[in-house]
Amino acid sequence: MTTATGKVNLLGLTQPQLEQFFESIGEKRFRAGQVMKWIHHFGVDDFDAMTNVGKALREKLKAFAEIRGPEIVSQDISADGTRKWVVRVASGSCVETVYIPQGGRGTLCVSSQAGCALDCSFCSTGKQGFNSDLSAAEVIGQVWIANKSFGTVPAKIDRAITNVVMMGMGEPLLNFDNVVAAMNIMMDDLGYGISKRKVTLSTSGVVPMIDKLGEVIDVSLALSLHAPNDELRNRLVPINKKYPLTMLLDACRRYISRLGEKRVLTVEYTLLKDVNDQPEHAEQMIALLKDTPCKINLIPFNPFPHSGYERPSNNAIRRFQDLLHKGGFNVTVRTTRGDDIDAACGQLVGQVMDRTRRSERYIAVRQLAESESAANRN
């Protein structure tokens, strides 16, 4: 990708693309591996820091290329350790990246678009509409920024980022080429060396692109389902009017069958009080998914202003989970993380919170967590 400076941004180039770039400037293809390792393993954005690259080539790179990531606007840390970065992309829009630590695993939730065109009724990102696709550099740049923030390199066993999920702002399959390029860099040993099983793309159901995805890359697939019948899903996830459930699940099964290796589909289901959390919805879901190798992730709704929806009670959540368990499914309930910094699922809107209000909220939540911890010890 050529930036506003007229130079090629090397950050978003896959290894084959980097090889082509070096050939285009009269250099050997092996230089791609050297430079790619500097960029992604060590977070370098200055060609002069590349000590195994000769001075003449470094000067040529300065003339034709640059390494430019998104601009960090703010970083917040939740009381539970969740981190959220707000970054500004070339279009001027802001997007959000969220890091969720849990046990020995660290999951980075990456955005693919500024805003979203799908307008799912329970998601705050969709309420702002679509602004722009992110370039491959802006997608992988979120991993690059987070990795640098933690001061780790991919070769380390104890690296902070072990999993990446394309579940941030936007519909990844509507920014297909750039997202695929970024995921290839994530999995490349010269990039971040993340296992294909630990890179997950989440889609609301762009059926033709699910089939195309299976032809070009091997990553885990998650489906944002949220309703067990077409009538309700048409209302909650409007793209269902174009690609109804029968068509959508057929595409998901085709994708999973291509992967083999006992891979399964992750089904995401946001629970909305008195909307999709009733026993009949669980029974419909069991019937809908009976022929689909899958695990189900229930997501209690994370409130945001003017959404019109509420989070179900804990009893309602447990009841729904138990019914699915009895139906033979592996079911987990996602623990809400980062809601004190608006980093929970469905809350990403690319806004920068007022610093004073942000600090007050963080302190209040931290104090609450500390008091609850002390009470539990007593």
From Swiss-Prot:
Gene Ontology biological process terms from the UniProt entry: rRNA base methylation; tRNA methylation
EC number(s) on file: 2.1.1.192
Family matches, as CDD domains: Radical_SAM (cd01335)
Compartments it resides in: Cytoplasm
Domain (Radical SAM core): residue spans on this chain: 102-342
Active site: E96 (proton acceptor), C345 (s-methylcysteine intermediate)
Name of this protein: Dual-specificity RNA methyltransferase RlmN
The organism of origin for this protein: Pseudomonas paraeruginosa (strain DSM 24068 / PA7)
Organism classification: Bacteria, Pseudomonadati, Pseudomonadota, Gammaproteobacteria, Pseudomonadales
Gene label: rlmN
